Amino acid sequence: KTKLGAFLDLETTGLNYLSAEIIEIALVPFRYSSDGRIFEVLEPFNQLQQPKKGLIPEEITKITGITNEMVNGQQIDVARLKEIVSQSSIIVAHNANFDRRFAEAEFDFFATKPWACSMSQIPWRDEGLEGGKLEYLAMKSGFYYDAHRASTDCYAGIELLTKNLQTSNKLTFNVLLEEARKETRRIWAERAPFDLKDILKERG
């Protein structure tokens, strides 16, 4: 029996989820088994959104290639997005700490789902790799892609999950699922003093 997972990637106007906005979302569903084998990649959900608070900063356009003209009048189909998320057993993101905050702040239905991070929850360094950046991992796994657009990042992430790790030879997605199944706790530091933000960030 297979389950449905979904790989998420966002492009945003900045790094702070309290002030920046989502300008592109990609969610690529895939079918997988409980031991981490991915059998099928399904039709992607990929949409742009015009920010409500002004224009896309120039430096963000340089990184993502997304212009104000491209997002003009665009809006995310929340009902369709919710449908995909509700059917998914797990949401995977590369650097989920970033994507999850934005996703849950804008769409509350993400908060009820289990999440997994393909960057922090796989021991890449133990597997002989120097870091967890997606482009680097893709290159080391033998494939290249056009980074910094949401849908291509998702496809690259899914491709990475289908590979065996270099040192242990374990299936990457199986390792991630085992890690994601461990019990975790989330702590919110709401209305913490501004001068404590760096300390809190360091502590995760």
Show the residue positions of the predicted features.
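Acidic two-metal-ion nuclease catalytic site recognized across multiple nuclease folds
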Residues: 1, 163-203
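Conserved non-catalytic scaffold segment of RNase H-like nuclease domains
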Residues: 1-114, 127-148, 174
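Short, contiguous strand/loop micro-motifs
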Residues: 44-45, 68-69, 120-122, 183-184
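Short, acidic/small-residue loops that bind anionic groups at enzyme active sites
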Residues: 112-122
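Extended, compositionally biased eukaryotic interaction scaffolds
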Residues: 119, 125-130, 140, 161-167
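Acidic, divalent-metal-coordinating active-site segment for phosphoryl/phosphodiester hydrolysis
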Residues: 152-160
